[in-house]
């Protein structure tokens, strides 16, 4: 189980958030408010046909996220 970023996860993957980059601060704050925090479990539900955006599930919340935003989230695929 190699560490990677959320942008590299595939549909169906279940991931554990290990770290979120310090910058950009605004994005980090928004992710924290949505429940994307270290230790959270994320499931990749869908990826758009051109690869961007991706739909993820964090707890009971469904989110749509751009790949550029997903690159600041370090994960471990379970």
Where are the model-predicted features located?
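Short, surface-exposed secondary-structure edge patches
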Residues: 6, 31-35
């Amino acid at each position: 189980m190699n560490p990677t970023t959320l942008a590299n996860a595939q549909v169906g993957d279940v991931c554990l958030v290990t770290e979120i980059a310090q910058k950009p601060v605004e994005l980090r704050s928004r992710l924290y408010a949505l429940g994307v925090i270290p230790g959270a479990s994320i499931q990749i539900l869908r990826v758009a046909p051109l690869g961007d955006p991706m739909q993820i599930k964090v707890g009971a919340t469904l989110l749509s996220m751009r790949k550029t935003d997903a690159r600041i989230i370090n994960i471990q695929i379970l």
